[in-house]
Regions:
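N-terminal basic, amphipathic alpha-helical segments
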Residues: 1-180, 201, 385, 389-396, ...
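Short glycine-rich anion-binding loops that position phosphate/pyrophosphate groups of nucleotides
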Residues: 165, 298-302, 363
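A generic "structured core" feature
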Residues: 221, 250, 255-264, 316, ...
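Conserved core of the PLP fold type I
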Residues: 179-323, 334-336, 341-349, 423, ...
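Conserved core segment of the aminotransferase class I/II
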Residues: 175, 351-353, 359-421
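Short, solvent-exposed loop/turn elements at beta->coil junctions and helix N-caps
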Residues: 361, 441, 482-487
Length: 523
């Protein structure tokens, strides 16, 4: 159908002169507010006349009026199109859903605000928590720069941002084949479709997850201990809503740490207490006496990269047990270990049944799958499932079946082995550059896991890393500073070098650019 016929223009007035003005005004408004986008082809006048119930002469006059004013252009032999550039004095505005004015009503939900409602006035019907700049910045930068399209002219040549993966190396052909096999099996047994969904997650997938985490993370559990989620973020949200009593529950978070996890618990009404980290991970002795929930990345602290030492692991679990607190373990990239003695997940030694283990397939497979999981104590599972059901009944069944087959047939293990080799090479190249070319300014933080390396500023170097990051951006190199991950965005200065999407040539190029910038700006 023609785009013009798909938008809601409202009824066209009757009578030749009235219908002309009515149709003209509505088409002009649709062009100005973007419902008819630049370059949209308008249908022939005969079709428009028939659709809107006017004479063809009326439709012709409307088109000619818009053409004369510069709202549309005519291309010989092709038709009439919405102009790319509107006439002088006219401007396109974002289409906004209007709401009736009145006490407590918002004037518009999106698009530019009216003069009567300045940006400084909060929307009356929105939760004020989500209007806080700290919250919008914590969630905004994290998602926007990963999913918002950017023009080719502004795309980064070298992307050192953390938490990105090299999807170019994912075996899409194998995953498609496995997914098709699983769906064909479901098609042959339609009676099993309902049971294949399951509020707690597809049972075959939960079985496969138990095998996967037992082999890679020494976490031994039953399928009944697993809740399948739409990624790790939904797991954090579920835990926050299940564990937090608004205004009372004290949640300790690593500082610096992962902002979206912090926001999930804050949104549920928790009292957030930032706790520092060092070379051994979370500083356990700094945990508040009244702590109820402790959020930690013990294997590969985000973003600094430290591994929680064995002594601190023992102390952390004992502290949680003695204070009737619980631990949320974020094991976001634990499959990728390169050197050093292996330290198992906290959950693997959880005799006290106080650890909630959060895993994801975003790093070892694809973020687009939106699939994660939560290993929880038996006493909490019923509540967690009920909380999840408030937002969705279950994750995508085809995706769950595809991932289950991918794991069960050994493809995930093979893919992880391949990517571990790829990431190891990139990591070694980065570490060599950090200790060599950049050693005058930066010192890498010892780390054995993951897809990024953090480097702190040496005491002898005086650097404005925020300025350095801005200059690098102008040279098509994207990088994050450590300070942006602190609760108050103040702390030990450093840079984070993600190697998920950069090959060896890009690493060399990015390091060379950074060296030149540091030479000019550092002392």
């Amino acid at each position: 159908m023609d785009p013009l016929f798909e938008i809601d223009l409202g009824p066209v007035a009757k009578g030749s002169r009235d219908s002309l003005q009515s149709l003209y005004r509505q088409l002009k408004a649709a062009i100005q507010d973007g419902r008819l986008a630049a370059g949209t082809r308008l249908p022939p006048t005969r079709k428009s006349a028939a659709f809107f119930g006017t004479s063809r002469n009326t439709a012709v006059e409307v088109y000619e009026k818009l053409l004369n004013e510069g709202y549309v252009v005519s291309r010989h032999g092709s038709g009439t199109y919405v102009a790319d550039k509107l006439p002088e004095g006219a401007s396109r505005t974002s289409f906004a859903v209007q709401r009736p004015a009145g006490k407590g009503a918002t004037s518009r939900l999106n698009g530019p605000r009216s003069a009567a409602q300045p940006a400084s006035v909060p929307e009356p019907r929105l939760n004020s928590f989500w209007l806080c700049p700290e919250v919008t910045s914590a969630m905004g930068f994290w998602r926007e720069e990963r999913v918002q399209p950017v023009s080719r002219a502004h795309s980064a040549t070298v992307d050192f941002r953390p938490a990105l993966i090299d999807s170019r190396l994912f075996p899409f052909d194998i995953f498609r084949r496995v997914s098709a096999q699983q769906l064909r099996g479901l098609e042959k047994r339609p009676a099993t479709f309902k049971s294949a969904q399951g509020n707690q997650g597809n049972y075959r997938l939960r079985e496969a997850i138990t095998q996967h985490i037992a082999l890679t993370r020494a976490v031994v559990c039953l399928p009944e201990d697993i809740l399948v989620t739409s990624g790790a973020q939904q797991a954090f949200d579920i835990l926050a809503r299940a564990l937090v009593i608004p205004g009372q529950t004290v949640v300790a978070v690593e500082d610096p740490g992962y902002p979206p996890m912090r926001v999930a618990f804050a949104a549920a009404g928790a009292k957030i207490v930032p706790v520092g980290v060092d070379a051994e991970g979370l500083i356990v002795e700094r945990l508040p006496a009244d702590v109820n929930v402790i959020c930690v990345c013990p294997s590969h602290q985000f973003p600094c990269g430290a591994t929680l030492s064995a002594s601190r692991r023992k102390a952390l679990v004992e502290l949680a047990r003695s204070r009737s607190a619980v631990i949320v373990e974020d094991d976001y990239d634990g499959e990728f270990r390169y050197d050093g003695a292996s330290l198992q997940a906290l959950r693997s030694a959880d005799a006290a049944d106080v650890v909630f283990y959060v895993g994801t397939f975003s790093k070892c497979m694809l973020p687009a799958l939106r699939l994660g999981f939560l290993v929880a104590p038996e006493w909490a599972m019923r509540t967690l499932v009920a909380v999840k059901n408030c937002s969705d009944w279950h994750c995508s069944t085809p995706v769950q079946l595809g991932v289950a087959g991918f794991i069960a047939q050994g493809h995930l293990a093979r893919h992880v082995r391949k990517m571990r080799h790829v990431y190891r090479q990139r990591r070694e190249a980065l570490l060599m550059a950090l200790t060599g070319e950049l050693g005058e300014w930066l010192e890498p933080v010892p780390s054995f896991y993951g897809m990024h390396v953090a480097a702190t500023v040496r005491d002898s170097a005086r650097l404005d890393l925020e300025l350095v990051a801005e200059i690098l951006q102008s040279h098509n190199v994207k990088i994050h500073t450590v300070t942006r991950y602190y609760v108050n965005q103040q702390g030990q200065p450093g840079l984070i070098f993600g190697y998920g999407v950069v090959g060896l040539p890009e690493i060399a190029q990015g390091i060379d650019t950074l060296r030149k910038v540091l030479t000019r700006t550092g002392s």
